[in-house]
């Protein structure tokens, strides 16, 4: 228990230092971190769910190579979310924000049967959340932002104020050599009143999202 707590604390300190650095250097690093790990072909590639936010004001395409088949990676994606398998990122930082996250290092059978319409939370009730828009096991998962109050998927078109429309997509591209490219993409549209907020959130999302990809790789390769 003590060892686990120290590990979480150490990772959180590293994550916090990275957050500070990326926030300060965001204007210079923005193009790099929004394409972290992805090839030009992957950035340009059309993915399921792209049509849900047709004119994104912000977004990214990131990718990582995992040395195992898609079947070994999918279970970790299927159980993603608060109150499920976690978000595989800096747990200590997430919980400082009140997200009540507990990341698992096990495959949880009770969360493997993911269905369209399922709710995926990033924190407790009232925090950002998503609905499963489409799911193709061992291949593709598309989430669409839901209203934190009603937990219903939002409209495709942004409203004037206090509104964000977003998709979050995971795509597994299995290669002939037995490795798999895990591609993650987010497309975001928002009202003008939220522009500054999202510009501040963007570099934070990179640090947390990068850690998520690295952790999923570690977990999947460990079980391969």
Task: Label each residue range with its predicted role.
Residues 136, 145-147, 186-188:
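A mature extracytoplasmic/lumenal domain signature
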Residues 73-76, 132, 182-184, 216:
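Hydrophobic pocket/interface hotspot
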Residues 113-117, 135-143:
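Short, hydrophobic/aromatic-rich segments at coil-to-beta transitions
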Residues 6, 10-121, 219-224:
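Hydrophobic ligand-binding cavity/cleft-lining segments
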Residues 59-65, 140, 165-167, 179-181:
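Intrinsic-disorder/low-complexity, polar/charged segments enriched in Ser/Thr/Lys/Arg/Asp/Glu/Gln
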Residues 69, 137-138, 175-178:
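Short strand-connecting beta-turns/loops that link adjacent beta-strands
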Residues 43, 150-210, 214-218:
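Beta-strand/loop substructures that line and gate deep hydrophobic ligand-binding cavities in soluble
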Residues 62-64, 130-132, 166-174:
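Hydrophobic/aromatic beta-strand elements that line small-molecule binding cavities or substrate pockets
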């Amino acid at each position: 228990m003590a060892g686990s707590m120290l590990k979480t604390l150490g990772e959180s300190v590293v994550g916090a230092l990275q957050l500070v650095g990326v926030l300060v250097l965001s204007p210079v690093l923005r193009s790099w971190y929004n394409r972290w790990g992805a090839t030009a072909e992957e950035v340009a590639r059309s993915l399921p769910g792209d049509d849900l936010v047709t004119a994104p004001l912000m977004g990214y395409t990131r990718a990582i190579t995992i040395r195992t088949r898609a079947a070994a990676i999918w279970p970790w994606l299927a159980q993603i979310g608060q109150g499920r398998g976690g978000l595989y990122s800096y747990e200590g930082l997430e919980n400082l924000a009140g997200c009540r996250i507990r990341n698992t290092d096990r495959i949880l059978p009770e969360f493997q049967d993911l269905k369209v319409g399922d709710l995926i939370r990033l924190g407790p009730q009232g925090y950002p959340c998503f609905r499963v828009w489409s799911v193709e096991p061992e291949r593709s998962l598309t989430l669409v932002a839901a209203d934190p109050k009603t937990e219903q998927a939002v409209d495709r078109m942004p409203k004037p104020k206090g509104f964000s429309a977003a998709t979050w997509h995971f795509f597994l591209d299995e290669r002939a050599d037995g490795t798999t490219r895990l591609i993650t993409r987010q497309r975001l549209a928002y009202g003008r009143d939220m522009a500054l907020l999202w510009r501040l959130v963007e570099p934070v999302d990179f640090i947390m999202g990068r850690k998520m990809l690295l952790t999923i790789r570690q977990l999947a390769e460990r079980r391969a």
